[in-house]
């Protein structure tokens, strides 16, 4: 069976995966994901019409964000999950049609739109249709490129909206925009210029969604504060929490209190330690390991069970597969799943009992790392930072936010961080930080040279900080600040962060280790001419370029 997927940075030969994903996704799963997205586009088209006549159901909003999130790289690999979701999507689509008919809307007028009208009899029908609706069904290379750019941005937006929703925060305008964007990528009358404008609008709603999630996280758990995080281990059994979901972590910490089981973060969960609300748990020990792609070795050594709350999951080895638990929209065939109850709560008793039977984690490193430099904390230090800039103690900031990945060429980011002059400061968020957050880069007048704002969505914090500095220095343009952008990307959440930065007017962003495979030459040319987007070359030449040497 054939597939075509080029949504992540590791797309084969920077062109696309055609038989199996570099991520481990099989062709049938890739195609089913395409069909789910296709059907969500149909649902979006219909739900916009339903909104016009006063019909909008909460379950449609939730289904949309969960469906989109499940197709992000390294979230869900389970064929049966996608078959089930597609059937649910068709049922929901038909329910919205019925609601429209009851309101007097002539739904038959839309029967020529395949995303709205396709049907199935058997699973084999679903499999067959799934092979016809993928990325390559758009023939024009530039239109295809822009449609995918927008779709991947909306996937990233959906992930952030999902996390906010889990904490009880929702903005109907964001859901409306996601539906609008997905409906418009079905519209063959739109031009390249139309889609460029829609991509910028996607960036605008990306900012709004990250702001909403920031509000959800900080209202629930307090503002991140400067925190030293232990990277060693204790002599108790433990549970390792990976992904991004703070609510799952909170529930697990509550349920493990007094059990003798320690809880550790992994990967993108590291920033949980920065929130005041999580500091009251004495059994919340520290962070274990590094970025997602090293999990095959680190999960093995951890000895205890692992809870995957979101991406990034890689296909687990048999040696530890029985210790992996998934929840939310994460899935992998043969791995245990912890569902959400009708009350929104999760019962973690099985994973806790499992942990009690396990040996303590193997120590892989010791010491501490520092983080918690989100916008509220950094703005408390604003006077000190401004003074350091004015005196020349800080000459330049480098935003090195984003994602980490497997490619050997990503050692560039470690070498780049090491080579930066001592009068520069790195601003980071996301798992890209693991390439340099354990280096001893020192400080400038007490300001650490690596300021970690948090998870990938906390790139929003970096934008807030930049806007505030622009205001303090009385500048007209954000690009007049002594800030350079050298961003590492991997999956679709990085796409919405990029579009958000472009919407905010940030120019001359450098993206690596490769430019996205889904950007056609012409679309790349537009981004270069309009926004100064660039790639990376080597540390020495790039430093000269950034520093104007």
Swiss-Prot record:
Residues recorded as bearing Cysteine persulfide in the entry: 403
Q: According to its record, what are the GO cellular component terms? A: cytoplasm
Q: Which cofactor does it need?
A: [4Fe-4S] cluster; hybrid [4Fe-2O-2S] cluster
GO biological process terms held by the UniProt record: response to hydrogen peroxide
Residues binding hybrid [4Fe-2O-2S] cluster are 244, 268, 312, 403, 431, 456, 491, 493
Q: Which UniProt keywords apply?
A: 4Fe-4S, Cytoplasm, Iron, Iron-sulfur, Metal-binding, Oxidoreductase
Q: Which regions form coiled coils? A: none
Q: Name one Pfam family in it.
A: Prismane
Top-rank lineage group of the source organism: Bacteria
Residues annotated for [4Fe-4S] cluster binding in this entry: 5, 8, 17, 23
The answer to keyword Metal-binding applying to this record is: yes
Q: What is its main location?
A: cytoplasm
For this protein, what is the EC number? 1.7.99.1
Q: Which reaction does it catalyse?
A: A + NH4(+) + H2O = hydroxylamine + AH2 + H(+)
Entry function: Catalyzes the reduction of hydroxylamine to form NH(3) and H(2)O.
Tell me the protein family, please: Belongs to the HCP family.
- Protein's UniProt name: Hydroxylamine reductase
The scientific name of the source species is Caldanaerobacter subterraneus subsp. tengcongensis (strain DSM 15242 / JCM 11007 / NBRC 100824 / MB4)
Classification from the root reads: Bacteria, Bacillati, Bacillota, Clostridia, Thermoanaerobacterales
Q: Which gene encodes it?
A: hcp
């Amino acid at each position: 069976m054939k597939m075509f997927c080029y949504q992540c940075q590791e797309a084969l030969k920077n062109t696309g995966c055609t038989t199996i994903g570099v991520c481990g996704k099989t062709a049938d799963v890739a195609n089913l994901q395409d069909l789910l997205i296709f059907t969500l586009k149909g649902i979006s088209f219909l739900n916009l019409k339903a909104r016009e006549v006063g019909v909008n159901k909460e379950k449609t909003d939730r289904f949309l964000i969960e469906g989109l999130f499940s197709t992000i790289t390294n979230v869900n690999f389970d064929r049966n999950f996608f078959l089930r979701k597609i059937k649910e999507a068709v049922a929901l689509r038909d329910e919205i049609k019925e609601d429209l008919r009851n309101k007097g809307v002539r739904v038959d007028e839309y029967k020529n739109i395949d995303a709205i009208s396709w049907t199935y009899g058997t699973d084999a029908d679903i499999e067959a249709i799934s092979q016809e609706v993928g990325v390559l069904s758009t023939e024009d290379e530039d239109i295809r490129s822009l449609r995918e750019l927008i779709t991947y941005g909306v996937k990233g937006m959906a992930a952030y909206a999902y996390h906010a929703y889990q904490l009880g925060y929702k903005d109907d305008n964001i859901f409306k925009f996601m539906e609008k964007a997905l409906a418009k990528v079905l519209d063959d009358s739109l031009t390249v210029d139309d889609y460029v404008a829609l991509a910028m609008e996607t960036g605008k709603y990306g900012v709004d969604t990250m702001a909403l999630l920031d509000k959800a996280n900080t209202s629930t758990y307090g503002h991140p504060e400067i925190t030293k995080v232990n990277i060693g281990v204790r002599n108790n059994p433990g549970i390792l929490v990976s992904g991004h979901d703070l609510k799952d972590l909170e529930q697990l910490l509550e349920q493990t209190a007094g059990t003798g089981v320690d809880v550790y973060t992994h990967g993108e969960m590291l920033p949980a330690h920065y929130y005041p609300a999580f500091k009251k748990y004495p059994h919340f020990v520290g962070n274990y390991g590094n970025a997602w792609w090293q999990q095959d070795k680190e999960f093995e050594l951890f000895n205890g069970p692992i809870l995957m709350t979101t991406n990034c999951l890689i296909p687990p080895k048999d040696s530890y597969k029985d210790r992996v638990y998934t929840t939310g929209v994460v899935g992998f065939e043969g791995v245990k799943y912890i569902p959400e109850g009708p009350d929104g709560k999760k019962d973690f008793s099985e994973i806790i009992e499992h942990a009690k039977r396990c040996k303590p984690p193997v120590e892989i490193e010791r010491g501490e790392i520092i983080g918690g430099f989100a916008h509220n904390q950094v703005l408390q230090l604003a006077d000190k930072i401004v003074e350091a800039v004015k005196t020349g103690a800080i000459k330049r900031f480098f935003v090195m936010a984003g994602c980490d990945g497997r490619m050997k060429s990503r050692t560039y980011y470690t070498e780049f961080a090491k080579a930066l002059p001592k009068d520069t400061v790195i601003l980071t968020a996301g798992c890209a930080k693991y390439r340099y957050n354990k280096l001893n880069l020192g400080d400038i007048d007490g300001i650490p040279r690596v300021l970690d704002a948090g998870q990938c969505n906390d790139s929003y914090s970096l934008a807030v900080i930049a806007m505030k500095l622009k205001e303090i220095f009385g500048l007209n343009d954000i690009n007049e600040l002594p800030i350079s952008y050298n961003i590492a990307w991997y999956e679709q959440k990085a796409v919405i962060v990029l579009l958000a930065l472009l919407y905010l007017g940030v120019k001359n962003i450098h993206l690596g280790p490769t430019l996205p495979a889904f950007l056609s030459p012409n679309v790349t040319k537009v981004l270069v001419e309009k926004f100064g987007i660039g790639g990376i070359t080597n540390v020495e030449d790039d430093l000269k370029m950034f520093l104007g040497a």
